[in-house]
């Protein structure tokens, strides 16, 4: 992947004006940044104002904001996690941000709900008091993983918005992502 240009970051003014108007009474918001500078911590806090809960995909948190080949590193402003309800990350992102994929590594990030996607091995849900492996869902046919993470995140917050517990939401998200990547 290659970054050709870097746009302006989302600002607190964006989050408190036109974005707030567009969101209205929305309770759950999915944030999927391309680069770590797309949503500064202050903007995430503004997006989480009131009763909104944020799910942030970690892919943007580990990507450097520079033109050229996509590069990743571990530096992240710890305040970026302060306003998150859910952090969704894959194994590579977990190793970069948390130093590992074990529940204790993930809990150290301080996010109430963390969902670690494990590709064909399922997922791992980690909360302050609980960790549960989400079983893999068999996939038939040729697999195209394009959009699997975004689909997982959308299904997770959709289930949570309907009142599902985190583990139920993770199971639903895992099932939907498996269905969407199969071309059978």
Region annotations inferred by a language model:
Residues 32-105, 121-122:
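Conserved beta-alpha-beta core of the PfkB/ribokinase-like small-molecule kinase fold
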Residues 8-10, 62-64, 139-141:
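A short acidic, often aromatic-flanked loop/helix-cap motif at beta-alpha or helix-coil junctions
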Residues 1-38, 42-53:
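Conserved N-terminal subdomain of the carbohydrate kinase-like
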Residues 71-78, 104-184:
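Conserved phosphate-binding/catalytic region of the ribokinase-like
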Residues 25-27, 51, 83-85, 111-112:
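Short, well-ordered alpha-helix to beta-strand connector turns
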Residues 22, 97, 180:
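Residues that form generic nucleotide/phosphate-binding pockets
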Residues 5, 89, 136-139:
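Active-site donor-binding loop signature of nucleotide-sugar glycosyltransferases
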């Amino acid at each position: 992947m290659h970054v050709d240009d870097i746009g302006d970051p989302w600002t607190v003014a964006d989050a408190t004006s036109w974005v707030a108007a567009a969101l209205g009474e929305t309770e759950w918001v999915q944030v999927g940044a391309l680069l770590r500078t797309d949503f500064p911590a202050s903007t995430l806090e503004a997006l989480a104002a009131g009763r909104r809960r944020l799910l942030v995909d970690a892919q943007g948190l580990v990507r450097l904001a520079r033109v050229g080949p996509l590069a990743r590193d571990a530096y992240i402003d710890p305040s970026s996690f302060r306003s998150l309800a859910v952090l969704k990350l894959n194994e590579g992102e977990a190793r970069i941000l948390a130093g590992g994929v074990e529940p204790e590594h993930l809990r150290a990030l301080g996010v109430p709900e963390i969902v670690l996607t494990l590709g064909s091995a399922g997922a791992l849900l980690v909360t302050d008091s609980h960790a549960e492996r989400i079983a893999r869902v068999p996939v038939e046919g040729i697999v195209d993983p394009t959009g699997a993470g975004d689909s997982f995140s959308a299904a997770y917050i959709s289930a949570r918005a309907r009142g599902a517990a985190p583990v139920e939401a993770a199971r639903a998200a895992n099932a939907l992502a498996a269905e969407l990547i199969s071309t059978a």
